[in-house]
Amino acid sequence: LRPAGCFDMHLGKNLYDDKLPNEVKYYEVSNAEQIQACDGSGKLVARSNGGNNIEELYGAGGWVASPAELLRFLAVIDKDPGIPDLLSDASIDYMTQEVPSAYPIGWIETTSRGEWFRSGTLAGTSALMKKQKDGYSWVFLTNTSSWKGSRFPHYIDNAVRQAMASVH
């Protein structure tokens, strides 16, 4: 991550007491039910404080980062000539190839038009990182939950798309 200019991007922890110095507090909906702790103790906890096993999600996410850090990371793998990439073009092409009925590597969706989409939603957080076909890239993060669940990033994508279309 350091070659990408990312100095404050870390793997998250399960408990609020173990949160990183620049990490936010996560807020769930007010009537969220508690669940058994992921550590097997049987204790009832909030999903965002020991209910979700973030440490087992490292292969799929579980990162703590600011929008700026995520954009720095994206900038070194996006094939934009303005900032040199850390990966070869062949690796980026492989990672972002559009494969019917399968996920690309590290992304939720990629298109033949050059769009890349990665989202993640857990209790207390939602994230969306997008590289658009027009060359714009952006990140949206929240430290709150929505009952829209995994569909929430799609609502945000639509809102950002409409906003950007109104200023072009």
Question: Where are the regions a protein language model picked out?
Answer:
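Short, flexible micro-motifs
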Residues: 64-65, 123, 127
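Zn-dependent metallopeptidase/amidohydrolase metal-coordination segment
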Residues: 118
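A broadly conserved detector of short glycine/acidic/proline-rich loop/turn motifs that flank catalytic sites
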Residues: 111, 122, 143-144
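Short, gly/Ser/Thr-rich active-site loops of penicillin-recognizing serine hydrolases
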Residues: 112, 147-168
